[in-house]
Amino acid sequence: ECETYEGLFNFYQDRRDGKSYLEIDTSHLNKEYIYFSYYENGVLEAGSVKGRFRGSKVIKITKFFNNIDITVENTKYFFDNESPLSNAAKTNINTPIIISEKIIAKNLNKTRFLINADNIFLNESFQQIKSSYKPGYKGFKMGNLSKSKTRYHEIRNYPENTDVIVNYTYENKYPSNRGGGAITDSRIISVLVQHSLIRMPKNNYKPRFDDTRIGYFTTQTNDMTTIDRVNYRDFINRWHLVKKDSSKDLSEPVQPIIWWIENTTPYELRNIIKDGVESWNIAFEAIGFKNAIVAKQMPDDATWNPADIRYNTIRWFIQPGSGYAVGPSRANPYNGELYDADIRIAADFVTSFYKEFDEYVVPVTEDEITQLWHNHDEQNHDAHGACNYSDHLKREMAYGWNQLLINGGLKGTEEDLKRYVHQGLVDLVLHEVGHTLGLRHNFKASSIYSVEQLSNKNFTERYGISGSVMDYHPVCLLDGGNTLFQTKPGPYDMWAIQYGYEQFNDDNLLENLENIASQSNHPLLVYGTDEDSFGTSSRGIDPLCNTWDMSSNPIEFYKDELNSVNYLWDNLLDKFEVPGGTYQKIRSVFSQGIGEYMYAGRSATKFIGGINFSRNHVGDFSQQSPFTVIEAKKQREALDFILVNYFDKDAFDFNPELLNKLAPERNEDFRDYVWNLDRPDYPIHSVVKRMQMYPLYSLYHPRRLARVKDNEIKNNTTDVFRMEELFTKVNDVIWQELELKENINSYKRELQIMHISMLSNILYNTDSMPADAVAFARSSLSEILKNIYLSMANNNVDYYTKSHQEYCSKLIETILDPKIQIN
């Protein structure tokens, strides 16, 4: 009466009512297995993003009288068997029974047992799915699990793994927060989760210790029996790669890392993906492995499924409107051995490039500046192994293509397009395969070459554009369109692979690894990852550890970028206002330039109060301090860049003809774009306000101001960038019209109101602000008010300016005088 799914754990499902059973036999008892789960689909606001890992742990199956128990083993602590302390290994360390199910049937020999699978998988026995909410949380919340609506989505069984995909449904009849547009009905949320039970790998794999100077994902363990100052015993996550013949300088591995390109992949892209995968062999050949990585094509009539963990696959799937691509891998929780990986690439990463891109600039709300500033714990960037390279890269590719068409770098031929897509897709595949080899992001790698070097096509052809494929690279337009992407492993990648995979004798392993890692201060091997960068957040201290930047002088790169954007805007109509074209295309390309402008402004602020951070250890090559304050002249260059391009009275001046041709798409789509668009005309003031808002709030963020103050006494030179200089320069440029006795344009009027609001926030948030910042905020407001009074006596300004100045003066008066504020 049951559908049978044979595999690692046999699974049975009643054809009549769907009730399911899991078979445990004596071969399973008293053995350890790996449990792994991730979101197959979900809703961002519910914390369930597609592809996000839920966790990996070791479970043990035992029989207790008439029950089958599943316990979770604690893998976080190591006890050396030679130490007497190992006798207390289980003391105060929890190994809980998370599942205990009554045996409901057994065979005559009592070697096979059936238990209720519904009680295991149709609830949260293995893993908590619903998020926990802190007291006072007012965001979107999932309701209670609905037993009647939670059901199996798919069951897949293979010799090495059993996968159970469950559609969990949560109900909240009266939600206080209804969430965003992706939530169809806020009362009911469905989340798709895959549970995997996996056979524990058994081989002679030898784990390798982690070193913080090199970026690998790790399996964390603490050695409880060591007397060393630091008891971390973390292992890097890597594949079991061993030479067939260790006596040869170059040998094939016993078992190569094989990637299967799924048969859903378009024919014209298969060789591109193969190129991206096998380009990693450059790094492996340098350490003696021939054909360490092999890419094969999955046959159209293949009898195996990509979900079978015996096959590493690059999967091509449909996710409309997304440039999603991710390269997750799975590691043994005991030792970090990688045993399975799947790279998923959304078809829209390539297909959307051929279309007119959505605009991704939205108007700013009036109170957003205050909300952003008060949010001192700005959103982490790519925390805990997540990767959003592909979604941003598709936008960069769109902008880069249009820029090259306008500046003549490419002619737009079919051959140009093929070459462009080839390079971009190889770049993406290299990045995602790098993750599956165990490598983390390296957001400092793009800083190793100068603008001059990157502008030389002979140099970029030979060396590429970056030190690593694990950075987030913009399309590099500096050499005129010759080398646009990073299409081969860089020097950092070669070094990291050497540390993780070069084969050594056990006797000198640790010495050899230390010799490799101690080269971390070499200029070509710089490394900084997610928790060093934090995107553009004020938590990131190193301006060279950044995403979507380029060169050893990012400010010079940003200047070139903004010049290119302005050139694009100036020539946009000449290139794209052609018969048969659409005004939506013009609007989209214009918005792509806005996106570049926004990111440059916010990223440049990292130089203010910035600190170069090195992960080196004492005694490393070219010994240097971990922290080096950014020299004052570089901080001034960055501040001047922001002032001139974002806050100056001449910073923004758009062609009215262009603005009147930025028409949106009028065809309806599945997202109701036409109906949800707030304004069909282009909201230029709101967009400019957003461009100015991000660098403004970032400059005045409590963390940044605290670092500026601290750096004043950490600097070893007489030339010091001081908080006084920051406040004075920003004040002078934002309020420059008062000195010049000129009219204040509409963009500047909005900026000045934001500036007053920002200074007010500093003044009345004394707990989080340095005392000097509070004092400077008050003196700034007083000085601005005095200059407004002087300017109001000038009768040569327009009515807009007079009204604005009167409003600003009253606003500042209420801020400075508590009695007025109370009244």
List each model region and its residues.
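Secondary-structure-rich domain cores
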Residues: 257-295, 431, 435
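Soluble non-cytosolic domains of exported or imported proteins
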Residues: 15-16, 52, 230, 263, ...
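Short secondary-structure boundary/capping segments
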Residues: 37-39, 276-277, 357-360, 449-454, ...
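The catalytic-center signature of Zn2+-dependent metalloproteases
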Residues: 297-317, 422-479
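Auxiliary tRNA-acceptor-end handling modules of aminoacyl-tRNA synthetases
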Residues: 1-265, 283, 287, 298-415, ...
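An exposure/low-complexity boundary signal
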Residues: 77-79, 83-106, 110-127, 409, ...
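Sec-exported extracytoplasmic/periplasmic mature domains
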Residues: 278-289, 319, 434-435, 439, ...
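Conserved catalytic/binding loops enriched for acidic/polar residues
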Residues: 415-420, 445-823
